[in-house]
């Protein structure tokens, strides 16, 4: 991002790589709309271009730069496609170059990479696929949440009102183990 004089970084998705993302025959990286954490990363013009491409009104999507985990810059195109009834942002026209440049980095199925958007100094839409999140970091996050749950369970033995509140937040806490969102637990008195 620094090399591009980048600004306005936004976490788009914490993306797990699937077999289809690594398939050079498919030549694309897809990001399902329901996994996008910050949906306002496109300008009005970019949104219009992507929509027109999806409706087959225009041939091209939005040209973007993507910086891979090894700090290589690649020219790609961002589009949106409907696959199996769900909309996805899709990086095409250059995704195979990203795969080739990261062979020694060994992209593997189920590796998790944070995907960020940012603007270059000229305002061009750029993305950064940052180094993968080690499995130990995800494990540590899950252990921290589990410890919080155990601590709450010990403190909940006192009253039924608290137990009801805990049951509600217990569900929310387990959902948070797959994200990086913080849980807020409040008590009813």
UniProtKB/Swiss-Prot annotation:
Q: Please tell me where this protein is predominantly located.
A: nucleus
Return the Gene3D superfamilies for the record.
Answer: DNA-binding pseudobarrel domain (2.40.330.10)
Q: Kindly state which keywords UniProt assigns to this record, in alphabetical order.
A: DNA-binding, Nucleus, Transcription, Transcription regulation
| Compartments, record wording | Nucleus
Keyword hit for Nucleus: yes
One annotated GO molecular function:
DNA binding
User: Key word Nucleus present in the record?
Assistant: yes
InterPro entries per UniProt = At2g31720-like, DNA-bd_pseudobarrel_sf
Question: Which stretches hold the DNA-binding feature?
Answer: 33-133
Which cellular component appears as one GO term in the record?
A: nucleus
Q: Which PANTHER family match?
A: B3 DOMAIN PLANT PROTEIN-RELATED, DOMAIN PROTEIN, PUTATIVE (DUF313)-RELATED
This protein is called B3 domain-containing protein At2g32645
Q: Which organism is it from?
A: Arabidopsis thaliana
């Amino acid at each position: 991002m620094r090399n591009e004089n980048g600004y306005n970084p936004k976490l788009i998705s914490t993306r797990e790589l699937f077999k289809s993302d690594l398939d050079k025959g498919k030549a694309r990286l897809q990001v399902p709309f329901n996994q996008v954490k910050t949906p306002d990363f496109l300008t009005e013009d970019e949104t219009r271009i992507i929509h027109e491409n999806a409706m087959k009104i225009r041939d091209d999507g939005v040209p973007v730069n993507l910086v891979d985990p090894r700090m290589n810059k690649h020219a790609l195109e961002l589009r949106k496609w409907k696959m199996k009834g769900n909309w996805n942002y899709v990086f095409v026209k250059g995704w195979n170059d990203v795969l080739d440049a990261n062979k020694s980095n060994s992209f593997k199925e189920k590796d998790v990479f944070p995907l960020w958007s940012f603007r270059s100094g000229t305002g061009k839409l750029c993305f950064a696929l940052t180094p993968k999140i080690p499995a130990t970091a995800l494990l540590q996050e899950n252990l921290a949440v589990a410890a919080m749950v155990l601590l709450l369970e010990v403190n909940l033995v006192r009253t039924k009102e608290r137990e009801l509140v805990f049951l509600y937040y217990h569900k929310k806490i387990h959902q948070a183990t797959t994200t990086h969102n913080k849980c807020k637990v409040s008590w009813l008195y």
